[in-house]
Amino acid sequence: MSRKLPNDLRSTTVLEAYRAHVTERAQENIPAKPLSASQVAELIELLKNPPAGESEFLLDLLSTRVPPGVDEAAYVKAGFLSAVAKGETPCSLISPEAAVELLGNMHGGYNIETLVGLLDDAQLAAAAAQQLKHTLLMFEAFHDVEALAKQGNSHAAAVMQSWADGEWFTDRDPVPEATKMVVFKVTGETNTDDLS
């Protein structure tokens, strides 16, 4: 039977363990592993009741150490941020607007349903549209945005126009005139697994 640690001690232990992991990996000149689904769940509990002096670190972990897309950790992150954006879960460190921005940084996957749904939200529609304008991994949700635009939703129409104009590309820094590279030549047959 495992003994549950008090919240202060548990949070310190979780953060200390992650910092130790970062230090260990840095000594090998490799980045820290992204957070797992269970680590993200623990992080969310800390975000709801942040230990003193850890707010910035917690926000950095949520924004930069959770893989985007459709892995289990991204699912947990998207669920939490969706609840914050919709006002279902209060979080003193993340406003609904900030939650929308963090959802947009996930680039597709579990964040899409919430962002598309927020196109109908009077307070957050503009923020959701801004994030969707730079999200390309929409899959079937493209049709949902299109349907909203056809129903007269101006935010959805703005997203569709942005995609048509390629703003996701034209808003980026220009492509450099020249790029220096190193070529790794392998004789015989190889695949990306060999390079991983």
Region spans (language model):
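Amphipathic alpha-helical packing elements
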Residues: 7-44, 49
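Conserved hydrophobic register position within alpha-solenoid helical repeats
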Residues: 54-58, 95-102, 128-132, 156-160
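Alpha-helix N-cap/helix-start positions at coil->helix boundaries
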Residues: 52, 89-94, 109, 121-126
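Fe-S-dependent hydro-lyases/dehydratases of central metabolism
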Residues: 130-196
